[in-house]
């Protein structure tokens, strides 16, 4: 995760702003600079290489002292920064909006995936600039539309029906902020269209999840799509979701947290996010993740549980 101010800076033209991507030499200069505390939140002028991000965001970049940040010296950083600028320059951002826009925390991996989709000649985003920009504006939280299959970050499709598409995420192969844990495995489910979904299509998805992904929890980050994650990583997701929710509220980026379909979401996660929306502390909310929940009656009585052992997934074992 990183703020948009880590990728670009605003330049006033007439009554609105144009956004310009940082170059990696300017960032490198900022990372070595001694800056007064009162200037930590201001864009840094490297003199030689142009404007750099505010020094308060130093920890967002990978250095000898911080291996958890972005690999800003890769070509992928420049591609992501350019893509963000293209999207921001397609809309009007005024002086009253610019600080709010640049403070938005975005998923770096999501944006890298959109770059990969853009470069794939077989992908619809390669052929449609309008759909590409729409996808980016959704990813950076500017659009109130949800991420559907056409505007999704992408990955490897492992399941699809008339209503849903399930993607295996490819973060292990990323350049900008790869996941280093080789045991990482995670999926995302997007709706094909933002419209009411028939019970039969929900039933098909639940059957697929029950038999092929029975070692995983289905959760949501509140953005209109589902995530299918290992139970061992649920607490980590909870910390991130709670921190983002609080940060957005603090910065005035109040986005509706979408709880999604309770029949699909893991019961404990639904309880956690509901408690979070009510304003409870992180500790109170997280207790619900480890609490034994009363099993609800099967919402789909026709969904058979009669399967042979060799049909049950071994994924995640």
Curated annotation (Swiss-Prot):
Q: Where in the cell is it found?
A: Host cytoplasm
Signal sequence interval, chain numbering: none
Reported EC number(s) for this entry are 3.6.4.-
Q: Which cofactor does it need?
A: Mg(2+)
A single GO BP annotation from the record? viral genome replication
The enzyme's first-digit EC class, named in words, is: hydrolase
Q: What does this protein do?
A: Participates in replication and packaging of the viral genome. Plays a crucial role, together with NSP5, in the formation of virus factories (viroplasms), which are large inclusions in the host cytoplasm where replication intermediates are assembled and viral RNA replication takes place. Displays ssRNA binding, NTPase, RNA triphosphatase (RTPase) and ATP-independent helix-unwinding activities. The unwinding activity may prepare and organize plus-strand RNAs for packaging and replication by removing interfering secondary structures.
Subunit info here reads: Homooctamer. Interacts with VP1; this interaction is weak. Interacts with NSP5; this interaction leads to up-regulation of NSP5 phosphorylation and formation of viral factories. Interacts with host DCP1A, DCP1B, DDX6, EDC4 and EIF2S1/eIF2-alpha; these interactions are probably part of the sequestration of some host SGs and PBs proteins in viral factories.
**What name has this protein been given in UniProt?**
Non-structural protein 2
Organism of derivation = Rotavirus A (strain RVA/Cow/United Kingdom/UK/1975/G6P7[5])
């Amino acid at each position: 995760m990183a703020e948009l101010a880590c990728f670009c800076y605003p330049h006033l033209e007439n009554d609105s702003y144009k956004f310009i991507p940082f170059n990696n030499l300017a960032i490198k200069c900022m990372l070595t600079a001694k800056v007064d505390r009162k200037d930590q939140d201001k864009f840094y002028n490297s003199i030689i290489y142009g404007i750099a991000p505010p020094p308060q965001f130093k920890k967002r970049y990978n250095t000898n002292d911080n291996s958890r940040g972005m690999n800003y010296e890769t070509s992928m950083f420049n591609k992501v920064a350019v893509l963000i600028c293209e999207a921001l320059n397609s809309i009007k951002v005024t002086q009253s909006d610019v600080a709010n826009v640049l403070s938005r925390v975005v998923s770096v991996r999501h944006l890298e995936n959109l770059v990969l989709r853009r470069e794939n000649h077989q992908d619809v985003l390669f052929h449609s600039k309008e759909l590409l920009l729409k996808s980016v504006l959704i990813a950076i939280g500017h659009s109130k539309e949800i991420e559907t299959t056409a505007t999704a970050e992408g990955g490897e499709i492992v399941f699809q029906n008339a209503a849903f598409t399930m993607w295996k995420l490819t973060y292990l192969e990323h350049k900008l902020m790869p996941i280093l844990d080789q045991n990482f495995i995670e999926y995302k489910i997007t709706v094909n269209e933002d419209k009411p979904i028939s019970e039969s299509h929900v039933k098909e998805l639940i059957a697929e999840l029950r038999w092929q992904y029975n070692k995983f929890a289905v959760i949501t980050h509140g953005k209109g799509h589902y995530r299918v994650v290992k139970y061992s990583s649920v607490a980590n997701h909870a910390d991130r979701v709670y921190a983002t929710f609080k940060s957005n509220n603090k910065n005035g980026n109040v986005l509706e947290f979408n709880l999604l379909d309770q029949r699909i979401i893991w019961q404990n996660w639904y309880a956690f996010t509901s408690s979070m929306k009510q304003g409870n502390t992180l500790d109170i909310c997280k207790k619900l993740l480890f609490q034994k929940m009363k099993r609800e009656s099967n919402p789909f009585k026709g969904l058979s549980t009669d399967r042979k052992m060799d049909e049950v997934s071994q994924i995640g074992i």
